[in-house]
Amino acid sequence: DEEPKESCSDEMCVIYCKGEEYSTGVCDGPQKCKCSD
């Protein structure tokens, strides 16, 4: 398993947080990210 990245590009993954779409955050899987906040 690869270690989580510090950031993700929108091409790598899209996350949803607080009802808004984000394209940055900690990678958590091939198509998921965690919110940076």
Curated annotation (Swiss-Prot):
GO terms for cellular component: extracellular region. One of its GO terms (molecular function) is toxin activity. One of its GO terms (biological process) is envenomation resulting in negative regulation of voltage-gated potassium channel activity in another organism. Pfam families: Toxin_31 (PF08119). Expressed by the venom gland. It is found in: Secreted. Belongs to the short scorpion toxin superfamily. Potassium channel inhibitor family. Alpha-KTx 11 subfamily. This is Potassium channel toxin alpha-KTx 11.1.
